[in-house]
């Protein structure tokens, strides 16, 4: 085993970080110790994960994550359609002037209101009721589902919650949901089109368990979506 890789594996940070990465966590610069560790040992750990047919990726925005290949020994993860939609809206908010004005902090209600502003209500209602319209109770159910999606994305490192206040801060890892709008032009307008129109490759296989995310350059089917390789 190469000396640097042995040092990396022997580091007390490695066991927990390895488990997080395998569970789909994205490590952004907000996670100071883990991000510095990955930066220091990136080439060595990249070789380590290659043994599992998995790539350690450092995105252009600086965050790290694992991307499994088709032959990976580590399982992929799936996200629901609503998870993907919430992620895209989070990316839109990250690009917004409001993020700077609010010091990067948003509330659950602000996310929900932005979602209703950007996406037709009938499309959102179909995610909850399979109908194009809904009652006040259905809207409450939608709000709870949005909160559930936000909690799932928090576990993946997309947002950082602030106590029990219903507030959160968005990390640069949300660019996993905006990877196809980084090529010049008005990125915020392009992200808005991505939210409203979608750009799709539909998948139907259902992995046996949730662990690693692939890339969200793809739209989704009604139930589950597998993240595809980056362009």
Swiss-Prot record:
One GO term describing the cellular component: nucleoid
Pfam families associated with the record: MukE
Keyword Cytoplasm: yes
Region feature Disordered, mapped onto this chain: 204-231
Subcellular location field: Cytoplasm, Nucleoid
Keyword entries, A-Z: Cell cycle, Cell division, Chromosome partition, Cytoplasm, DNA condensation
GO biological process, one term: DNA replication
Top-level taxon of origin: Bacteria
Bias (Acidic residues) ranges: 219-231
Gene3D superfamilies listed in its UniProt record: 1.10.10.2250, MukE-like family, C-terminal domain
Principal subcellular localisation of the protein: cytoplasm
Subunit architecture: Interacts, and probably forms a ternary complex, with MukF and MukB. The complex formation is stimulated by calcium or magnesium.
Function according to Swiss-Prot or TrEMBL: Involved in chromosome condensation, segregation and cell cycle progression. May participate in facilitating chromosome segregation by condensation DNA from both sides of a centrally located replisome during cell division. Probably acts via its interaction with MukB and MukF.
Family affiliation: Belongs to the MukE family.
Family annotation (HAMAP family): MukE (MF_01802)
Name the record gives this protein: Chromosome partition protein MukE
Taxonomic placement: Bacteria, Pseudomonadati, Pseudomonadota, Gammaproteobacteria, Vibrionales
């Amino acid at each position: 085993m190469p000396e640097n890789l042995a040092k990396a594996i022997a580091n007390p940070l490695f066991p927990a970080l390895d488990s997080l990465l395998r569970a789909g966590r994205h490590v952004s610069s907000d996670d100071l110790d883990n991000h510095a560790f990955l930066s220091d040992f990136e080439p060595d750990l990249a070789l380590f994960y290659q043994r599992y047919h998995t790539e350690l990726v450092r995105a252009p925005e600086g965050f790290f994550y694992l991307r499994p290949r088709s032959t990976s020994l580590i399982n992929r993860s799936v996200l629901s359609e609503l998870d993907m939609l919430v992620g895209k809206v989070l990316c839109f908010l990250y690009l917004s002037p409001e993020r700077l004005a609010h010091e990067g902090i948003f509330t659950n209600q602000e996310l929900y209101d932005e979602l209703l502003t950007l996406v037709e209500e009938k499309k959102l209602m179909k995610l909850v009721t399979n109908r194009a319209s809904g009652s006040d109770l259905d809207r409450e159910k939608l709000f709870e589902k949005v909160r559930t999606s936000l909690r799932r994305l928090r576990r993946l490192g997309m947002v950082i919650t602030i106590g029990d206040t219903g507030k959160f801060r968005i990390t640069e890892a949300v660019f996993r949901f905006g990877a196809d709008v980084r090529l010049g032009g008005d990125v915020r307008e392009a992200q808005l089109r991505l939210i409203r129109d979608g750009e799709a490759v539909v998948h139907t296989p259902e992995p046996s368990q949730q662990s690693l995310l692939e890339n969200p350059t793809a739209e989704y089917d009604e139930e589950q979506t597998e993240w595809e390789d980056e362009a």
